[in-house]
A protein has these predicted regions:
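Catalytic-core segments of hydrolase enzymes
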Residues: 1-32, 89-93, 110
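Hydrolase catalytic cores
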Residues: 26-105
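Hydrophobic alpha-helical scaffolding
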Residues: 8, 12-16, 54-62, 74-78, ...
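Short, glycine-/Ser/Thr-/acidic-enriched flexible segments
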Residues: 12-14, 27-29, 34-37, 60, ...
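Secreted peptidase-domain scaffold signal
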Residues: 3, 105-177
């Protein structure tokens, strides 16, 4: 239905990272499900009585993103996890309203709606997880926090910038976060 679900999580995280990183179709997704499953029995109104069931949630959106990643790796099997993330983020499209403004804040849509074709054929590199070293973080040497902050009025901003993140959407896609 091309709308952000009312139950979608929003960011930033406690550690100041923008979440979600991307969004994908996950509402009212028609999928295969047997008639004898607990969900089908508990909610027959969503089951067609045959092989299909309508569901919504991150479990549905995760399948869409996973499918795109599988296509990316089939096309370019040498991609590292950071390169996959970079291409997935940089190829996503922000939701824009009829007046050319963001339909949702970047704390609601991240880099935007995933685009399978653009992600598979992207050649973008070096834009995900810059400077993050998980080994140092786990060893307690260096801890990483995002730049998102909440002010005393409840507004989210990005540390070091004079404007709100959702007014400067390019910051996300150009990997300055």
């Amino acid at each position: 239905d091309d709308r952000l679900a009312s139950f979608s999580s929003t960011g930033p995280t406690v550690e100041g990272f923008v979440k979600p990183e991307v969004v994908a179709p996950g509402g009212h997704v028609l999928g295969l499900m047997g008639t004898n499953t607990t969900i089908a029995i508990t909610h027959p109104e969503y089951h067609d009585g045959g092989a299909y069931f309508t569901m919504s949630g991150t479990s549905q959106a995760a399948g869409v993103v996973t499918g795109i990643v599988a296509l990316m790796l089939q096309h370019s099997p040498w991609l590292t996890p950071d390169e996959v993330k970079c291409r997935l983020l940089s190829s996503s499209q922000l939701a824009i309203d009829g007046e050319g403004n963001l339909a949702y804040s970047l704390f609601q849509q991240g880099a935007g709606l995933v685009d399978a074709y653009a992600a598979v054929y992207s050649e973008t590199t070096g834009c995900a997880n810059q400077g993050l070293d998980v080994a140092k973080d786990l060893a307690g040497i260096e801890h990483y926090c995002g730049r998102a902050r909440r002010d005393e009025y409840g507004n989210y901003t990005i540390e070091g910038l004079d404007t709100f993140l959702w007014n400067d959407a390019f910051l996300w896609n150009d990997a300055f976060l």
